């Protein structure tokens, strides 16, 4: 795979997350009834960063949960030998019933991950509303899903791949486009 371009660097990612944080606060008229839920793996780190920024804006903490959607995927990724799904587990520290849940993920592509996340959430409670925040929206939807908060729209071809590197997992913050 050949890197075509770096489309977001660390400063651009920081700015995008700051803007999304302000949009979440403004859209929800505060965050009293909100819970951020990151989709494993990179969505969790982005949710934690958003929570920190929202805390600075509002002067109060917002709960952050972790959602593992492995068993909800219709294109389940299996371990090669055992053919068993690799499940890491979800951790949502509060009851999400009647809360506004803001799902957080790194890239929105076909919409299948978000659909699986909504199915997983509904098994954990009945939120009053589900919103979606993504760092990158690259288009090519297969399902009627749209993000409420987008860091950057990056139109791509189906021959390209978006890769998100985050400090917590990759020792750097950047988003790149690769040719397949």
Swiss-Prot record:
EC number(s) recorded for this UniProt protein: 2.4.2.9
GO MF, one example: RNA binding
Catalytic activity: UMP + diphosphate = 5-phospho-alpha-D-ribose 1-diphosphate + uracil
Enzyme class name: transferase
Motif range (PRPP-binding): 101-113
UniProt-listed CDD domains: PRTases_typeI
UniProt keyword terms in alphabetical order: Glycosyltransferase, RNA-binding, Transcription, Transcription regulation, Transcription termination, Transferase
UniProt xrefs under NCBIfam families: PRK05205.1-1, PRK05205.1-3, PRK05205.1-4, PRK05205.1-5
Family statement: Belongs to the purine/pyrimidine phosphoribosyltransferase family. PyrR subfamily.
Self-association and partners: Homodimer and homohexamer; in equilibrium.
Role description: Regulates transcriptional attenuation of the pyrimidine nucleotide (pyr) operon by binding in a uridine-dependent manner to specific sites on pyr mRNA. This disrupts an antiterminator hairpin in the RNA and favors formation of a downstream transcription terminator, leading to a reduced expression of downstream genes. Also displays a weak uracil phosphoribosyltransferase activity which is not physiologically significant.
Listed name of the protein: Bifunctional protein PyrR
Record lineage: Bacteria, Bacillati, Bacillota, Bacilli, Bacillales
